[in-house]
């Protein structure tokens, strides 16, 4: 069944299904009527020669320039030509499909003033698999993602390039092969297609979807390391975290203990320390803080997905045009900067647990670097180097982009969100985080093979999955294939899926 876009109910999960899995979309009937009513009001105002930003005026610094009737006809075309000014490699198809769905949902609110044909063409392109080729770099996150969205708007004129059936081709050819009519651009249509933070918001939504899975796997990896290090398990008692009251920590402690359930460590017969190091016993607080950051970001992103991110906006019921800055990406870029830092923070803690597994002074009886032949063999010594390299890069990328505004457009646009930079770097942070967590998983599995007690059911399951892809390190071998396989394993979510089948949902 198609996902209905009505301007009010687009979730991160629905957007992920549209962007990645080709779910069909349908424009809500009431939404289509709202679009028609808004357009009719706009055309009345055009006939009455009411001055409206971006309709019969220039844009940015030229907003005080009033266009003639003849200029209005061609203005949208030249606006899009001028704004299609990005650079670099094309954004992944899933990001662009997400942005298209987001823009349709903005129009569905009935305040953008474009012709219905524009919105319906975007719907048809999504459903038939025509995806604009969009340079990922060039947006400053206000007025929205102008440069990349302008490449989407080129398609409304049959210009630019698109991906169709796995091939990159001129948009006019793609539209013809898919049987999609080219609507052209009339007054307001171009600006109504580009003037919002839809690409950075779609990217952020997909990152949040993936980070939720990654954080759950961080809890599984943590549980494995805790067992391998023979941790005192009192710090993971959910009652401790309920007393403080942070929902993320409560959730995280519960997830960790689910993975450890059934372990010999819970019998009370094994000797453990009175208190372990912070990288062990404060794991629920740290991973939990990341969960709480993600929860805030998710609320912000879903508000943006269902909000009127546009300028100007039109209120048909009041016969009113309002100009403002609803394109400003800060409500998304600020929480997403925090999410990027949160992923890096959890990665740092993952590496610290791996360090304890490797270090014979800290590992409670494990061999140095988790190898049987210390001296002749170096075990997982260099795996830690790799994790450290990734984390340094994550730390650099965790500098907030939302505070990096550079004034532009003759200082008319003198504060911008830089939200696209946030979105791009968060993708890089998460990619590194898959590698860091994969290395902790590999080290924890190696360490558990040196222990002679029974771990928890969730930990046993994770260990079994890891051993499908990476063998026990008996003697030294090149480890880069193992690191790569572990990174891809974490990215796939297979460990999480199998563990949840055994212990129940970790969310």
Please provide the spans of the model-predicted regions.
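Polyanion/phosphate-binding surface patch
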Residues: 50, 65, 252
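Short gly/ser-rich anion-binding loops that grip negatively charged ligand groups
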Residues: 65, 85-89, 108-112, 287, ...
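Catalytic or ion-translocation cores adjacent to nucleophile or general acid/base/metal-coordination motifs
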Residues: 69-84, 356-368
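Generic structural signal for well-ordered secondary structure
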Residues: 35, 52-55, 68, 72-73, ...
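C-terminal auxiliary extensions adjacent to catalytic cores
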Residues: 2-23, 27-34, 38-46, 155-507
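Glycine-rich, flexible loop motifs
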Residues: 2-13, 19-49, 79-134, 226
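Short, well-structured alpha-helical patches and their helix-loop capping segments
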Residues: 107-114, 137-140, 144-145, 203-206, ...
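FAD-binding core of FAD-dependent oxidoreductases
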Residues: 53-75, 83-105, 133-157, 173, ...
């Amino acid at each position: 069944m198609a996902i209905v876009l009505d301007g009010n109910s687009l979730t991160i999960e629905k957007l992920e299904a549209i962007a990645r899995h080709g779910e069909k979309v349908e424009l809500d009937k009431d939404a289509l009527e709202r679009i028609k009513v808004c357009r009719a009001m706009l055309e009345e105002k055009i006939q009455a020669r009411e001055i409206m930003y971006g309709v019969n005026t220039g844009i940015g610094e030229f907003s005080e320039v009033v266009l003639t009737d003849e200029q209005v006809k061609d203005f949208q075309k030249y606006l899009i030509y001028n704004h299609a000014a990005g650079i670099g490699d094309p954004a992944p198809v899933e990001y662009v499909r997400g942005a298209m769905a987001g823009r349709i949902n903005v129009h569905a609110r009935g305040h953008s003033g474009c012709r219905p044909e524009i919105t319906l063409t975007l719907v048809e392109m999504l459903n038939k698999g025509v995806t604009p080729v969009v340079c990922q770099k060039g947006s400053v996150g206000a007025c929205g993602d102008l440069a990349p969205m302008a490449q989407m708007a080129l398609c409304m004129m049959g210009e630019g390039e698109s991906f169709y059936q796995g091939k990159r081709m001129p948009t006019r050819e793609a539209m013809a092969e898919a049987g999609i009519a080219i609507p052209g651009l009339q007054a307001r249509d171009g600006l109504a297609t580009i003037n919002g933070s839809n690409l950075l918001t779609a990217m952020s939504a997909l990152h949040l979807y993936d980070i939720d899975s990654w954080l759950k796997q961080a809890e599984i990896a943590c549980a494995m390391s805790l067992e391998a290090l023979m941790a005192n398990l009192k710090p993971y008692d959910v009652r401790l975290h309920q007393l403080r009251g942070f929902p993320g920590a409560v959730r995280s402690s519960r997830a960790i203990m689910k993975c450890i359930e059934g372990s010999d460590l819970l019998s009370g017969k094994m000797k453990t320390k009175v208190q372990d190091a912070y990288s062990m016993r404060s794991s629920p607080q740290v991973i939990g803080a990341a969960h709480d950051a993600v929860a805030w970001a998710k609320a912000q992103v879903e508000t943006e997905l269902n909000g009127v991110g546009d300028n100007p906006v039109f209120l048909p019921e009041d016969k009113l045009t309002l100009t403002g800055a609803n394109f400003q990406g800060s409500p998304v870029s600020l929480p997403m900067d925090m999410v990027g830092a949160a992923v890096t923070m959890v990665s740092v803690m993952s590496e610290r647990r791996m360090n304890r597994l490797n270090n014979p002074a800290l590992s409670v009886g494990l061999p140095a670097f988790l190898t049987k032949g210390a001296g002749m063999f170096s075990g997982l010594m260099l795996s830690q180097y790799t994790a450290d390299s990734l984390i340094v890069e994550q730390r650099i990328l965790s500098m907030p982009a939302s505070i990096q505004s550079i004034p532009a457009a003759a200082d008319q646009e003198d504060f911008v969100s830089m939200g696209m930079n946030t979105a791009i770097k968060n993708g890089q942070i998460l990619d590194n985080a898959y590698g860091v967590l994969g290395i902790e998983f590999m080290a924890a599995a190696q360490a558990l093979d040196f222990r002679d007690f029974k771990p928890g059911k969730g930990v046993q399951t994770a260990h079994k999955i890891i051993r499908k892809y990476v063998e026990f390190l008996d003697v030294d071998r090149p480890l880069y294939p193992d690191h790569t396989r572990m990174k891809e394993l974490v990215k796939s979510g297979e460990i999480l899926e199998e563990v949840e089948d055994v212990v129940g949902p970790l969310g």
